[in-house]
């Protein structure tokens, strides 16, 4: 069982292919043949006027005509949890023509409202002749295709930009691509010699099947490394192999010199999202499917004039069906069997609308994989009015924390950072995954199988790399590959000293099925209800449930099984540094003393200057001058007293009278930095050196001063303290001994604890 939840309903109604040549726009193809919006969710605030909209594009991204970044980063995925909200500003680019609007009002997406001057008999007669002249594939949602082709063919200013049109409750979203002014589809680039150091992961072809085609996702992340490594930039890269792999481009671009050559194509996705989820559903479909599919077609069009040839083939089949008066089903059967582009669009619709991975083949040398990333975890429980996903992994472990360093690699999923300290948890049986890999017969298969056999959920990527001699970068690529294909999940390494509890988000409705599956996997172990009952008690380390050393392996397998199904989650500890009033007062007094000292030094410096200026005077004069200055200084309010008066005024406010928490110690303000310095200066540390030699299991000199700087960056409330041993390379025993000494809520058994050490406030949650 797996806790990976498929994405919500993508709200996909249909997919349309629009092309434009010098002869005008053409509605080439749509799938499914008879789209329906009857089952779509109702919306109270319908849009009545079509209005094209597009998102703002930065000069370096979608809206850059001469840049090749859009056609070269076919594998890049936007930043799952993300977490990656972007503000989209929609700009109106006008409204459809009066004729189109009139036809829309008459038809009303299939309505039969008659014109004022038309009699019912004339209406029926014209309707019958219309059916004879126009076959069913020449209409879409009750309107003629000539209406849609005008509406969905934007101007060249929308080149490689998000094109969005609203018609009633439907939203039409596309990524139009226009031919360049020189008649080509992309800039010519100099060929680069293949580097001698390329590994098998850099050259492995796609495998092209949803079940066994693991190479797509793996190379997807291989190509998402920093493009500027080794001096290469985005503009120097060939189209990424993650989503598309094509034969070499001999001349950089292919053009058709005929009079009716194509100048634009636009694959439009028709969606009907709920009002409250409109922006989210549109964005995730555009970022993960629409834009990437458009980039793939753009590359193939530049290479082999692919889109234009397929469009001509589709139009020819439809024209032949018109002449032969073929049925709609027979025409679509022929289209799907003879046109790879029509088949690809149909596959995308069927897969994306059911929240699956769409694996498509454009040419024998070109394959793509598209998907809307699934939900793998949630950091919070849903509210009364929020959608619930029972069984989803409840954790904050894969959320970006304050100290996380953004790596060079991204992947398609809610986790934005695939850190080297994570481990890989397979979501299905290892044997079945290895069987699928062997059946795929890809060049990525052997290293992928080797990594799966070497991987354990108790070992991090860095540890597996050290043990198996697999480069860490390759391990991250292979792990991200399995995650992309929904066969694994990145988790903190399982450890018996960690605490695990029954997840509040577990799906108890599946307890019966899960119990049967659990008994098949662990027939001699305690039953699933018993394990859940034990873990529901007072939280304690998982090691306390393991009866003996011989049972450690099987109990780790049980824990992995429970984590995989979302039945348990790790209870983690988070902390902040507390600054009490006494420490604040001490720092304020120190600051006041320093300021008074600085003023005295400035005053002494100005006095010395006056004396030097009056040097020619007699000794009496100098004495008089000095006495005058001293008298003036004595008559003024003393600096220290004035500052104390100011501080007394400040103390009347609440912030100076209450304790504070330092939320970001690694980015502390100047005042917070002084608080931290004062805290560490108060730590008593002399008695620890003597105790280090009294016990053999006391691991060296446990000095808070020594580890304070390494620990403080984790005291931000977002980084679990369980990360410290893994990331700092320290033993868990040493780390928790130190943390228990400074934790306000704990009393370690080391002996007397000094009051000044208690500065850490901790909480526990997932």
From Swiss-Prot:
Residues 118-133, 217-250 have a biased composition (Basic and acidic residues). Residues 33-140, 186-257, 594-638 are annotated as: Disordered. GO terms for biological process: cellular response to amino acid starvation; meiotic cell cycle; negative regulation of TORC1 signaling; positive regulation of autophagy; TORC1 signaling. InterPro entries: HTH_NPRL3 (IPR056603), Npr3 (IPR005365). Belongs to the NPR3 family. Mediates inactivation of the TORC1 complex in response to amino acid starvation. Required for meiotic nuclear division. This is Nitrogen permease regulator 3. The gene is NPR3.
């Amino acid at each position: 069982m797996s806790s990976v939840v498929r994405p919500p309903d993508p709200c996909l109604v249909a997919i349309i292919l629009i092309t434009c040549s010098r002869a005008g726009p053409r509605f080439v193809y749509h799938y499914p043949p008879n789209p329906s919006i009857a089952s779509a969710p109702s919306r109270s605030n319908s849009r009545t006027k079509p209005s094209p909209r597009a998102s703002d594009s930065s000069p370096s991204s979608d809206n850059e005509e001469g840049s090749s970044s859009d056609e070269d980063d076919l594998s890049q995925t936007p930043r799952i949890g993300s977490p990656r909200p972007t503000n989209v500003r929609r700009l109106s680019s006008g409204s459809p023509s009066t004729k189109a609007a009139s036809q829309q009002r008459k038809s009303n997406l299939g309505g039969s409202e008659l014109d004022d001057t038309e009699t019912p008999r004339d209406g029926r007669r014209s309707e019958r002749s219309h059916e004879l002249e126009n076959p069913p594939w020449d209409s879409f949602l009750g309107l003629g295709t000539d209406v849609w082709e005008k509406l969905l063919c934007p101007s060249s200013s929308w080149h490689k930009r998000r094109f969005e049109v609203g018609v009633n409750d439907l939203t039409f979203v596309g990524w139009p691509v226009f031919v360049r002014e020189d008649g080509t589809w992309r800039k010519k680039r100099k060929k680069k010699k293949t580097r001698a150091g390329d590994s098998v992961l850099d050259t492995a072809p796609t495998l092209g099947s949803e079940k066994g085609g693991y190479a797509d996702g793996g190379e997807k992340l291989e190509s998402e490394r920093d493009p500027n490594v080794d001096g290469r930039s985005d503009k120097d890269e060939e189209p990424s192999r993650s989503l598309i792999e094509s034969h070499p481009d001999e001349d950089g671009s292919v053009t058709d010199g005929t009079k009716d050559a194509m100048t634009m194509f636009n694959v439009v996705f028709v969606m009907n999202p709920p009002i409250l989820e409109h922006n989210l559903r549109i964005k995730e479909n555009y970022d993960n499917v629409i834009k990437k599919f458009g980039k793939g077609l753009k590359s193939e069009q530049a290479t082999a004039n692919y889109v234009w040839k397929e469009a001509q083939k589709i139009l020819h089949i439809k024209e032949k069906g018109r002449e032969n008066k073929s049925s709609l089903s027979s025409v679509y059967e022929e289209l799907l069997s003879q046109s790879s582009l029509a088949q690809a669009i149909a596959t995308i619709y069927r897969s994306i609308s059911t929240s699956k991975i769409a694996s498509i083949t454009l040419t024998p040398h070109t394959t793509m994989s598209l998907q809307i990333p699934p939900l793998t975890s949630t950091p919070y429980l849903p509210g009364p009015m929020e959608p619930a996903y029972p069984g989803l992994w409840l954790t904050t472990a894969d959320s970006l924390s304050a100290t996380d360093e953004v790596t060079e690699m991204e992947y398609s999923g809610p986790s934005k950072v695939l850190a080297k300290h994570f481990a890989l948890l397979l979501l299905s049986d290892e044997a079945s995954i290895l069987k699928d890999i062997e059946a795929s017969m890809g060049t990525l298969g052997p290293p992928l199988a080797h990594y799966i056999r070497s991987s354990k959920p108790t070992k991090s990527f860095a540890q597996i790399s050290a043990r198996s001699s697999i480069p860490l970068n390759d391990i991250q690529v292979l792990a991200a590959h399995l995650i992309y294909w929904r066969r694994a999940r990145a988790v903190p390494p399982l450890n018996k000293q960690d605490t695990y509890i029954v997840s509040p988000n577990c799906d108890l409705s599946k307890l019966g099925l899960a119990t049967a599956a659990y008994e098949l996997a662990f027939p001699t172990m305690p039953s699933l209800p018993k394990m859940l009952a034990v873990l529901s008690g007072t939280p304690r380390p998982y090691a306390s449930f393991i009866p003996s050393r011989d049972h450690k392996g099987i109990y780790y397998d049980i824990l992995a099984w429970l984590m995989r199904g979302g039945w348990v989650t790790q209870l983690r500890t988070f902390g902040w540094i507390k600054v009490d009033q006494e420490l604040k007062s001490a720092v304020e007094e120190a600051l006041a003393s320093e300021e008074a000292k600085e003023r005295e030094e400035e005053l002494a410096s100005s006095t010395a200057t006056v004396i030097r200026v009056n040097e020619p005077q007699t000794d009496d004069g100098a004495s008089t001058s000095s006495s005058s200055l001293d008298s003036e200084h004595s008559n003024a309010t003393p600096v220290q007293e004035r500052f104390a008066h100011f501080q007394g005024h400040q103390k009347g406010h609440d912030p100076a009278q209450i304790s504070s928490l330092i939320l970001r110690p690694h980015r502390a303000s100047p005042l917070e930095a002084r608080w931290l310095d004062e805290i560490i200066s108060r730590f008593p540390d002399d008695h620890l050196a003597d105790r280090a030699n009294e016990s053999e299991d006391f691991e060296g000199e446990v000095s808070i001063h020594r580890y304070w700087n390494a620990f403080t960056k984790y005291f931000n409330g977002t980084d679990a303290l369980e990360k410290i041993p893994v990331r700092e390379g320290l033993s868990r025993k040493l780390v928790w001994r130190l943390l228990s000494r400074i934790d306000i809520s704990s009393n370690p058994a080391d002996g007397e604890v000094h009051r000044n050490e208690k500065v850490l406030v901790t909480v526990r949650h997932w």
